[in-house]
Amino acid sequence: MNTLKNKGRWIKPVLKYFGILFVLLCAPAFANECVSYKITPKITISAPTWTKEVVQPLEPMNMWHGNVVATMVDNYDIVADITSVEDGFCVGIKQVDAEIGYSNFLVQVDIRHVPNTCSYDAVLAHEDQHIREYLSVIDDFQVELHNALYSAADSVMPIFVYNSSDIDLAIEEINNKIQSHPEMVIIKQKIKADEEIRNKRIDKNDNSETLKKCFL
């Protein structure tokens, strides 16, 4: 009796082991089957409609310079190519609609500058230069952004899922792979670096002469 019980105890773990092994061995096979369903992804990139808000913090700032807080967004809408195959679905990329750029500029001006006065307008004019540079950086990198996004999207192979309920998770995984792709990481770093260079150039070339004239 003890021997039979022991055998019974071993049967379930062994069956469970073979079940797991079957899934592990078959999943790559199904994934390989999905490769044949890969298509060339279409890429579109648009810039968000941006807004500007001017505020005057209660605490004193540098009277000669304002400050711009730029909010950058990069959203990726994946249009999936879903193919029904034996035992599941292949989820690939048909199109990526990206929105990349600045959505908001928060301009801070020292509270000692009264709105609609010479000094207030002079500070705003300077900060508007920074805003124009932020926008021009995105414009100048459009080709590189498109190429980087295409390379990232084209590198992602279709993902196999067993159930239709897992398709959304597959699309989320595709999105993460695109955003973490080396070319996407590098292009964002290049944009940030160029922003810093251009903003420093504006401040370096500004001797505040326009603002100083307001106090003569």
Regions from the language model: what does each represent?
Residues L4-F18:
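Bacterial N-terminal signal peptides that target proteins for export
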Residues Y17-C26:
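Bacterial N-terminal signal peptides
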Residues D128-V143:
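Catalytic Zn2+-binding segment of zinc metalloproteases
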Residues A27-A31:
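Sec/Tat signal peptide C-region and signal peptidase I cleavage site
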Residues D87-S119:
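Active-site scaffold of zinc-dependent metalloenzymes
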Residues N32-A47:
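Short N-terminal segments immediately surrounding and downstream of signal-peptide cleavage
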Residues V35, T51-A98, A153-L216:
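Metalloprotease/metallohydrolase-associated module, dominated by Zn2+-dependent proteases
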Residues T117-Q129:
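Short alpha-helix carrying the canonical HExxH Zn2+-binding catalytic motif
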